[in-house]
C-alpha cells in the first residue's frame, strides 16, 4: 500500500479503482490431485462427480464419502452400508433416496446431474476477478 501511495496504482488495479501495486492475487486452486494431498479438500470450483467413490493410489484403494452427506445421513439415522451401497450402485447419486427432501437431493447433485450451462455461467461471473489462469471441466 505504501508503494502504491508513492508511485500510484498498477494499471490493472487502477482500472478496478483499487490503490495497489501487486494486484494479481486471485488464483483458482487446488486441482484434483492437490486436493487429495491436502486431505480431501474439494477439487477447486467444480462440482463433485459422485457422493461416494473408490480412490485408487499406489498404496491401495479406499472409499471416499461426501462428509456433508454422511453427516446428513447420520442425522436422519440412515448412515448405513445398505444406503451407501445403493448410492454407489447409482453412480454416486442420491436422487433415488426417498427419505431425502427435494432440497436435499438438489444440494447433493453430482456433476453429471447439474445443468452444465450453470457451470459456464458461474465461470463467466467469476472470470473478471481471477488474475491468473482458470479452467473448467464440463461433464
What are these regions (language model features)?
Residues 22-24:
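Short loop/turn microsegments at loop-to-beta-strand junctions
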Residues 5-6, 26-139:
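Catalytic alpha/beta core of large soluble enzyme barrels
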Residues 1-20, 87:
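Short glycine-cluster motifs
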